[in-house]
Amino acid sequence: MSKKILVVEDAEDNRRILRDLLSMAGYDMIEAHDGAEGVAKASEHKPDLILMDIQMPVMDGYEATRRIKADPALRAIPVIAVTSYALSGDEEKASLAGCDGYVAKPFSPRQMLAKVREILG
C-alpha cells in the first residue's frame, strides 16, 4: 500500500507540480487549499506525511500545524513546511510551530523527494 501525503497549498500550480512529482514517485496525494481545510483533511484521512505551505488564506501553515500537533490523534504525523519564506529565522519559526522539516521554494524535484523519503523512511 502506498503512502498518503496531504499537500496543503493554496496555489494550483504548486499543487499540480507536487501532484505530478509525488504520483510519479508512487505516493497517493490528498489536496487541501488552505490551512483550515488542511486540518480537516488531516483528521479525515490520517496521512503518512503533510507538506504544508506557510502563507495561505483563511489559516496559515503555522496555525494549521499547531492545531494538527495539538490533536492527540494527529500529533505523530510529520509535517514539512514548504515555503517561499526562506529568510533567517523562518526555519526556526516553522520548527517552533511543530514542523518536522523545512523545504524552501522554489525547490528541485530531487530535493523534495529526498526530504519526503528522509521523513517517511
Positions of PLM-derived features:
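Charged docking surfaces used in two-component/phosphorelay signaling
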Residues: 16-24
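Short hydrophobic/Thr-rich beta-strand motif most characteristic of the beta2 strand and flanking loop
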Residues: 26-33, 41
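Active-site beta3 strand of CheY-like receiver
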Residues: 45-51
